[in-house]
Curated annotation (Swiss-Prot):
GO biological-process terms attached to the record: threonyl-tRNA aminoacylation
InterPro entries: aa-tRNA-synt_IIb, aa-tRNA-synth_II, aa-tRNA-synth_II/BPL/LPL, Anticodon-bd, Anticodon-bd_dom_sf, Beta-grasp_dom_sf, TGS, TGS-like
Name by which UniProt lists this protein: Threonine--tRNA ligase 2, cytoplasmic
Annotated source species: Homo sapiens
UniProt catalytic activity: tRNA(Thr) + L-threonine + ATP = L-threonyl-tRNA(Thr) + AMP + diphosphate + H(+)
Length: 802
């Protein structure tokens, strides 16, 4: 042990000396560079030599740090073994000798301690050995990190002073490698410092307690910011991960924030998580929060991290397959140390209220051939009111769940014999067909041409389009006469074949192909969810083939199209322009021109929009559209995406005005509803099953006052049915008139038509609505005309407007 201690001290001493050498050499490099600028004709050999020497020293230092870490770890293990031996010897000696009885106060303290330990044991079932080993290594690395920080901050001259520009315009002075964003916030206002979730330094998310490394622009983000929410929920996931390790003793995998909350996946040998265990996990999380465990960040070499996480094959996979740099970061809170890019909140106490509410099983990285994992979901907020509002929202969302509405209203169902493929019953099929008819009507107004294309293609098509290389695992494939075929997951390659089947001229452009073809995607069984995630679906899919000069007008037309459709449904929407990413393909001049035209289209459209720089697809810029439903949720359905690459892949050309027969078109991928199935799910939940009249699967219920009026009721129902309305008649003799009316209202019939002897004589009906608004007696022909007009105009509040 003494030899290892001496070796560790020697390595540490050498490391510190070489850090000093690096600083001196680097200052020499700077000095020589300055001299070179002032004397350009002098010898310039020293600078490169010195920078190479600095690089060599740094490489050697990296190796020294690793050796130092290993020596310290061995030293710590040896000390731990020595302490265990000494403790065992002491216990043996105490057992051999007589011990005095404990005092009353000592006895009481012992009882309290045992009670606390038993309470903790009732929640925490396992404390794996790897936790202790992991902590030991982290502490050694932390000491090294603190030593480096001390070295960086040693100068003590004016070069240590940095300027921090806060987003509100204030300027604050600080010290490099010492001043933190939290200290800057506290200098402005302690209230601001406490309400800040995370910092943004020079555009990069930054831990509040992480020292600044130079002059900085600083933003202080609170929970109402989306990026801050993601950090808050990511930190909450670490709290859940800590609780899961203590409770289950399994191996953690991924624990990200999601749109509303967070989850953590864990591999647990030979068992599954039970929903009855979630309250126990929540209690552990609350205890962790009370401890205010600080989040500590360390940058560590990949080699050392593979040693740290050698017990966990999943973390090692991430390191080997996902980490392409020599170092990466880990974060610690309490006993948990997790491979993580961060950043995080200052300490666990910042999470004011937490709820662990759901569990499920999944596969490692979604691959059913890999290990089964247990996934646990949670949500957290900075105050109790937000949690109460969330719980209320969840109850409302539960009542609006499209699967519940679909079952109650007999719209659709799913069956194990065809997972992910919906069976639409007559009333559900009415909604489906009404939506597609609506879009077809709009197509006719906007000069779209509907086409029909095959459902399956030879794999050579997908190889040509590029989908085979990146998407084949999501396609249903099969062999026919030794060739591989696949059911189409999208329409665009087929439409490219349609464009290319004969020569095209500029006079034809733009060509707008629309297709309701059936699509299939091989979604994993665990991801299937009602109508929102299916394997078989249809889209209101269209592809516009146009010239570069026509992009602006075509985009304007697409925006007007989606506004017309979404306003009919009563949706508001958000627009985001996603521009050229770093890995873009094609000529930059074409990208610039296309992005300019997209911006012009959005400006002329007149609705608010935001820029998402670098978030476009590699093959073209796009406009992302999100609709907002009745309970405040956002859904992305529409697509407006430019594509410069498919025309190249399929060698699509047209003859231009000046006779160039090699001119490339641009493709605009465009959908408004997106998946018709998913849109039905969104509409079901948006309306809560109270469908607007034009889309309603239960538009009219005719109720006779008594048996003598039943024949007339059937006649009235038949007249409405012949005009295309979803009309029914209630002839149930076991119910009173009032009960029949109430049943029709609960079943969400938009209009209830009561007929008695008077109405029979007058050839009329007595009209009331599902909300019990009474319109009174009206002739059958007049009622039909009014309802036809309300259907034609797709009036949202038809019951009021009748």
């Amino acid at each position: 042990m003494a030899a290892e201690a001496l070796a560790a001290e020697a390595v540490a001493s050498r490391l510190e000396r070489q850090e000093e050498d690096i600083r001196w050499l680097w200052s020499e490099v700077e000095r020589l560079r300055d001299e070179q600028l002032n004397a350009p004709y002098s010898c310039q050999a020293e600078g490169p030599c010195l920078t190479r020497e600095v690089a060599q020293l740094r490489a050697e230092n990296c190796d020294l740090r690793h050796r130092l870490c290993s020596l310290r770890l061995c030293l710590a293990e040896e000390r731990s073994r020595q302490a265990t031996l000494e403790s065992a010897e002491l216990e043996a000696a105490q057992e051999a000798g007589a011990q005095p009885p404990p005092s009353q106060s000592q006895d009481k303290d012992m009882k309290k301690k045992k009670m606390k330990e038993s309470e903790a044991d009732s929640e925490v079932k396992h404390q794996p050995i790897f936790i202790k080993e992991r902590l030991k290594l982290f502490e050694i690395l932390k000491k090294d990190h603190q030593l480096l920080l001390a070295i960086y901050g040693k100068k003590g001259d004016t070069s240590n002073i940095i300027t921090v520009r806060v987003a509100d315009g204030q300027t604050v002075q600080g010290e490099v490698w010492k001043t933190t964003p939290y200290q800057v916030a506290a200098e402005i206002s302690q209230e601001l410092a406490e309400s800040t979730v995370i910092a943004k330094v020079n555009g990069e998310l930054w831990d509040l307690d992480r020292p600044l490394e130079g002059d900085s622009s600083l933003e202080l983000l609170t929970f109402d910011n989306e990026e801050a929410q993601a950090v808050y929920w990511h930190s909450s996931a670490h709290i859940l991960g800590e609780a899961m390790e203590l409770y289950y003793g399994g191996h953690l995998c991924y624990g990200p924030p999601i749109e509303n909350g967070f989850y953590y996946d864990m591999f647990i040998e030979d068992r599954a998580v039970s929903s009855t265990e979630l309250s126990a996990l929540e209690n552990i999380c609350k205890a962790i929060i009370k401890e205010k465990q600080p989040f500590e960040r360390l940058e560590v070499s990949k080699e050392i991290l593979l040693e740290m996480f050698k017990y966990n094959k999943f973390k090692c996979r991430i390191l080997n397959e996902k980490v392409n740099t020599a170092t990466t970061t880990v974060y610690r809170c309490g006993p948990l140390i997790d491979l993580c890019k961060g950043p995080h909140v200052r300490h666990t106490g910042k999470i004011k209220t937490i709820k662990i509410f759901k569990n499920s099983s999944t596969y490692w990285e979604g691959n059913p051939e890999m290990e089964t994992l247990q996934r646990i979901y949670g949500i957290s907020f900075p105050d109790n009111k937000m949690m109460r509002d969330w719980e209320k929202f969840q109850e409302e969302a539960k009542n609006r769940d499209h699967r519940k509405i679909g079952k109650e209203q007999e719209l659709f169902f799913f069956h194990d014999l065809s997972p992910g493929s919906c069976f639409f019953l007559p009333r559900g099929a009415f909604i489906y067909n009404t939506l597609t008819d609506f879009i077809r009507e709009e197509y006719h107004k906007r000069d779209f041409t509907e086409v029909l294309s095959p459902n399956m293609y030879n794999s050579k098509l997908w190889e040509a389009s590029g989908h085979w290389q990146h998407y084949s695992e999501n396609m249903f494939t099969f062999e026919i006469e030794k060739d591989t075929f696949a059911l189409k997951p999208m329409n665009c390659p087929g439409h490219c074949l349609m464009f290319a089947h004969r020569p095209r001229s500029w006079r034809e452009m733009p060509i707008r192909f629309a297709d309701f073809g059936v699509l299939h995607r091989n979604e994993l069984s665990g991801t299937l969810s009602g109508l929102t995630r299916v394997r078989r679906f249809q889209q209101d899919d269209a592809h516009i083939f146009c010239t570069v000069e026509q992009i602006e007008e075509e985009i304007k037309g697409c925006l007007q199209f989606l506004q017309s459709v979404y306003s009919t449904f009563g949706f508001s929407f958000q627009l985001n322009l996603s521009t050229r990413p770093e890995n873009f393909l094609g000529e930059i001049e074409m990208w610039n021109e296309a992005e300019k035209q997209l911006q012009n289209s959005l400006m002329d459209f007149g609705e608010p929009w935001k820029m998402n720089p670098g978030d476009g697809a590699f093959y073209g810029p796009k406009i992302d559209i999100k609709i907002k439903d009745a309970i405040g949720r956002y859904h992305q359905c529409a697509t407006i995406q430019l594509d410069f690459q498919l025309p190249i892949r399929f060698n699509l050309t047209y003859v231009s005005k000046d006779g160039d027969d090699k001119k490339r078109p641009v493709i605009i991928h465009r959908a408004i509803l997106g998946s018709v199935e998913r849109m039905i799910a969104i509409l079901s939940e948006n309306y809560g099953g109270k469908w607007p009249f034009w889309l309603s699967p239960r538009q009219v219920m005719v109720i006779p006052v008594g048996p003598t009026c039943e024949k007339y009721a059937l006649q009235v129902s038949s007249e409405f049915f012949e005009e295309g309305f979803m009309a029914d008649v209630d002839l149930d003799h076991s119910c009173t008139l009032n009960k029949k009316i109430r049943n029709a209202q609960l079943a969400q019939y938009n209009f209830i038509l009561v007929v008695g002897e008077k109405e029979k004589i007058d050839n009329a009906v007595n009209v009331r609505t599902r909300d019990n608004k009474i319109h009174g007696e009206i002739l059958v022909t007049s009622a039909i005309d009014k309802l036809k007009n309300l259907r034609k105009t797709r009036t949202l509040n038809a019951e009021e407007a009748f």
